[in-house]
Amino acid sequence: MKKIVSGVLFSLFVLPVFALYNSFGVPDSSEIRKELVESWFEAPLQNVRMNRPEIRTNSVGQKFQIRMEETEDSFNIFVAPYARIEVDVYSDKGKTTEVQDIYPGDAPGSWLLVRDKKSGKPLRIRYYFAADSEVFVQFLPSGKTALCDYLIFGCYAAKGVPTGLPFGRFYSSSFDQVVRWTENSLPWQYMQIHPDDYHAVQQMANVLKERNPDVILVDDAMYDDEGKPVYISSGKPRKNGELEEGKISVSGAGYLKWIADGIIEPLAGARLKRDPLLEPTVEYKKTGFQGILSEKYAISFSLDWVRNLASGVISVRTGRNYLYKDSGVDVTIEPFCAELTEKGIRNSFGYIENSGYSVKMLKPLLYVLAAQNPQLFYFGAIRETDRRSPEVKIFNECCAFFPYFDSQKRFKCEVFKDGSQMSFEEFFSRYCIDSVLLVKLHAAEEFYPAD
């Protein structure tokens, strides 16, 4: 009988077979690495090539594989922890699922040394500690000491931080030691994640998934504070031909209002009024291009809409009437100093007033926001660039982001737009050259969007 093992790992669920060795639950290879310095970390490339992959066990029974992988310019030495992964196996009898032993080079507890291929000199040491492999710390030699970086999905939360320690110290240092030595210089608060804290965020996202089949997209459509179908642009009643019994007919902006109303109606017995949502929140210079454009077009529609929606929700929750300028709803944090691009490292632009953040920074930004504020979700106003006239930038569309960490502490983000759910990857692909301004809202356990 022939078996075909799928070339793709269909299930990326790594089984938790590690014993907990330190306070962070990260498998620790430090005692093993002490014995590898001469034969793996400092030996010439030709000698390292002669080393066969090794399996070693630490004092608490955790297994690690030591191996070398070559690239065009460097050779990488991995000390990788044991894990098990489910794969689908196809044969003439059908499909079965098998559990296979692996040693992933980027799983929590993995340690990586990168060396230059020509000189053999060390370039960096990387510690993987998060469920998301694109979140890690790395150390780089600088003279007699080492500098440290903390990266989150290609963005530097810290870069070039002096450690005052010789680079060679990290050949045998445990992750616990790394955290202690850098506790005041690296943002370790981003790894203090408690999955149970995201219940309200996940519950709201699940409700929207259940209700989305009832939503149909209609241009310029919303429900007013009395639940009557009206036009956003005029406030006048909509025509019967645009309504469908048993369906929620809204535009993209009306969809976000429907979400906001689902939070406040259980609290106040009412919905948000239309007129305050259209109040301008930004003034453009009349002599500038955007100012001239704003005289003719509503170039800040979705920007004003999401800001005023969030301000309205805060007003109902607190019992105080907040105008946008006093509400503090905008997300303006600057957690990154640089980003890793195809052309190398460049300084991060971060937040731009009344424009928001580049969509390219959105995933690491939402990761940080979720780690810091597990009770929040976000409305986003999308500032699009006209493909034919790049100087024209308009806030016309909007969406909702629900970031959280799952039970395995892996980062997830549910995106809802125009009455439908979309993957973050799809959102990124569609709007990667644009920017998004985020406003924050508290997730509600009692969330009941209207029928």
Where are these regions (language model features)?
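Sec-dependent signal peptide recognition
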Residues: 2-10
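Cleavable N-terminal signal peptides
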Residues: 7, 17-18
